[in-house]
Amino acid sequence: MARVGVLLMNLGGPERIQDVGPFLFNIFADPEIIRLPNPALQRPLAWLISTLRSSKSEQAYRSIGGGSPLRRITEQQARELQSLLRQRGIDATSYVAMRYWHPFTESAVADIKADGIDQVVVLPLYPHFSISTSGSSFRELQRLRQTDESFRKLPIRCIRSWYDHPGYVLAMAELIAEQVRLSDVPEEAQVFFSAHGVPKSYVEQAGDPYQKEIEACTTLIMAELENLLGYGNPHSLAYQSRVGPEEWIQPYTDEVIEQLGEAGTRDLVVVPISFVSEHIETLAELDIEYRELATEAGIVHFRRVPALDTYPTFIEGLADLVGSSLEGPEINLDEAAKLAGRVKFYPQERWQWGLNTSSEAWNGRIAMLGFAAFLLELISGHGPLHAIGLL
């Protein structure tokens, strides 16, 4: 029997306060997160942003106990998935590969090779594909394949996105139903989906399918929820966690909460749709920041649906995904990294603002001038970024 390695890919998170700065640096040093015309600017800019944001982020992590629970939860998901797959007759071993903190992807790959695995199923713990999540993780795995001959020879099957998988949809609907039933008038409870946002340019310019997959997923979950409850609930969708002055996909979570309060909503059932594990966005942003906002807006009951974590229906759904991947047509890593015709991965292609090499040279000079202006404002404490509250 072939030995199967199941590689669970996730974001990662700082486990201690002193990890916050390095964790943020790793995020902003990723060209899938911040795209620059000159690669030489990536690490200096990542250092600046992580330095500026560390204090605020450290406060958020202190509010949830001093660190992220993401690694602990993901490793528990891996253990339970491994156990279930073995019960189903699959000789599987699960591995955790975090993108921006320990255990890094390199560590998981080293363990896979040391264990003599025969083939690998790559399962991103992001139900909805985005350039900045699954895309970045696939690209990192590609990079390791290119530099490691023994790993390159290992057969790999990839699961790209699974927002419409019946097991995932059912698990979400079951957890939502539990909270809806607690409402004073369950049929009137407002089901409010909050997804992590992405810059609007990702969707409109790069062709990122994330927003379409989120919207389609919401529709599927609401249909399943109605099957479970026997009645339909009003629902809405918004996007959270935006940073910086760039426009992100809308509507924004904070604005919709205020609108719902003004409209007289009493019972709000909040669904963290793009998060399969509890972490900073659910425990701090939703549970603390947005709960307070909802109270101020006049919403009486704020019930947050727990993240899937190791919910049995969810783990069964993950096992079904792995089984289907092993039985179905192979989707290799290169195919997984080319989800749509317009999706661009960076630095896979050069980020061109000009029509010729002279234009690109000027682009780089302009970027350097902008970077110098940013440094000057950082040192002086005055400028447009301070005026808009970014610094």
Curated annotation (Swiss-Prot):
Keywords recorded for this protein, A-Z: Cytoplasm, Heme biosynthesis, Iron, Lyase, Metal-binding, Porphyrin biosynthesis
Residues at which Fe cation binds: H196, E281
Enzyme class: lyase
InterPro entries in UniProt: Ferrochelatase, Ferrochelatase_AS, Ferrochelatase_C, Ferrochelatase_N
Record bears the keyword Cytoplasm: yes
GO molecular function term, any single one: metal ion binding
Entries under SUPFAM superfamilies matching the protein: Chelatase, Chlorophyll a-b binding protein
Compartments where found: Cytoplasm
Gene Ontology CC terms: cytoplasm
Gene Ontology biological process terms from the UniProt entry: heme biosynthetic process
CDD domains in alphabetical order: Ferrochelatase_C, Ferrochelatase_N
Entry EC no(s): 4.98.1.1
UniProt pathway: Porphyrin-containing compound metabolism; protoheme biosynthesis; protoheme from protoporphyrin-IX: step 1/1
Catalytic function, reaction form: heme b + 2 H(+) = protoporphyrin IX + Fe(2+)
Role this protein plays: Catalyzes the ferrous insertion into protoporphyrin IX.
HAMAP family (alphabetical): Ferrochelatase (MF_00323)
Family designation: Belongs to the ferrochelatase family.
The protein's name: Ferrochelatase
Organism from which the protein derives: Prochlorococcus marinus (strain MIT 9303)
